[in-house]
Each structure stands twice: as structure tokens, then as C-alpha cells.
Amino acid sequence: MKFKFQRKYLSIPYVLFLLLFVVVPVLIIIYYAFTNKNTGEFSFIHLQNFFSDKTNIDVLIISLVFALANTIICLLIGYPIAYILANKKINKNKVLIFLFIMPMWINFVVRTAATRELLTWIGLGGGRYPEFATLVGLVYNYLPFVILPLHSTMLKMDKSQIEASYDLGANGFQTFTKVIIPMTMPGIVSACTMVFMPTISSYVISDLLSEYNIVLFGSYIDLYFNQANWNFGSFMALIMLILIGISVLITRKFSKEDSTRASLW
């Protein structure tokens, strides 16, 4: 009897990878999040401790504010850049894209340290303006993750729809809001997902650039794990996972919009 190879067997390594490096770690986090550190028994003590401490709530809110601000700023800067690159000649396009990708080849910590030195040199570092310095670092590190998906989406835009909107009497603003944005919505959603979610858990940028004046949620998680308080650290990590899941559900709502529905009405 010959063994018939089926294509479904190709998914086995992928399934094993997900089980070992996604499902099992999440289950471990959930286990530690709802067990007492001293007794090992099931407990909601970490839930109570988290919401009873105002500092935890403040850090969570600050992290969400920075994540939202970083996403908005990256979109405002990255969208026109991606649009310009998508309308450049192919040779110039490749060179400019390379210039934006090149910093990503440098180690994340090295890039952040270089940003700190630059801000200090121009008088904006050293903890003088921690909020501004942190935002600069976040935007610098995550801007390429906005430009690349937007650029890829814009290259696939149907230019005839843009021309048709002008032929039908639409002005530039109407064409942008009613035609271009709907066609590039998949890229916008992808960009927001790739920036907002990592920013929530980021802590190296805020620690280095704000001189530890800005404490984000990721810093708190790192603090508790370094103190060997795995249980409370796991509970905070679980909260972060829930927030990321909520953001994914929100962005999926927009990603389901068909970009071909662009119109003037």
C-alpha cells in the first residue's frame, strides 16, 4: 500500500510552531496570572491588586496615549511619503525605499541610543523634555512600518478611479477622502496594527530617551519579572494581550471594507 502524500501534512510544522511558541506560552501566562505566588492556588488577588493601585491604571492610560499618539503621527508623516514614493519613477522609487528601510538593519537599541545622543546634542535630551523625546524615538523607529504597507497598497491603486473622480467634477479634497483613502484602507489598517500594538509593550525607547521619567506598560512588566514576581508580571502581560486583541478586532472591522467600493458618494 503506497503512502499518499497530502498537502495538509505541510501544515504540521506550522501547527507545531504555533502550539510551542504561541499557545503554550499564553497558557503559562494565564496560569501564573491567576495563581497565588505563595500558595500556588487559584486566585484573583492580582486582579484586585492591579485595579486597587492607581499607579497601574495611570501607567496603562499613559501607554495607550503614547501608542495612539505615535500611530497618528506616523500616519500623518508616513501617508504623504508613501503616496509620493508610489508615484515616483521606478528607479528613484527603489532608492528612496532603500533609504527608509536601511535604518531597520541597525540594532533597535543602537538606533535608540543614537537618537538620544542627537536629542542631547540639540538640547532636547537629557530628560528635559521626556514626552517629546519619547515620541520622537517612537516615531523614528516605527515610521518604516507605516510607509511600507501603505506604499505597497498605493502601488496597487486603480488610477482610473482617481481620474474618473476628477472627470465627474470632484475636487482634490473630495477625491482624497472619497476615493484614495478607501482604496488605501487595507494599508492604513495594516500600518496601524504594526505600530499601535508594539508601542503598548515598548519600554526600551521610553527608558533611554526619557531618562526613566516616562514609564510605559512594558517597563512595568519588565520590572516585575526582574523582581521574580512572575505572577503579577504575567497578569499585567495578560492585560496587554487583551488590549492587543481588542485593537485587532477593531482594525479587522475596517480591513473587511472592500477597497473597490471607493466612490464620490
Where do the language-model regions lie?
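Short cytosolic juxtamembrane segments of multi-pass membrane proteins
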Residues: 254-265
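Short glycine/proline-centered loop/turn elements that form peptide/ligand docking sites
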Residues: 157-161, 259-260
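Short hydrophobic, aromatic-rich alpha-helical segments embedded in or entering the lipid bilayer
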Residues: 39-52, 212-225
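Glycine/proline-centered hinge or cleavage motifs at structural transition points of membrane proteins
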Residues: 168-169, 182
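Short, Lys/Arg-rich, polar N-terminal cytosolic tail immediately upstream
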Residues: 1-5
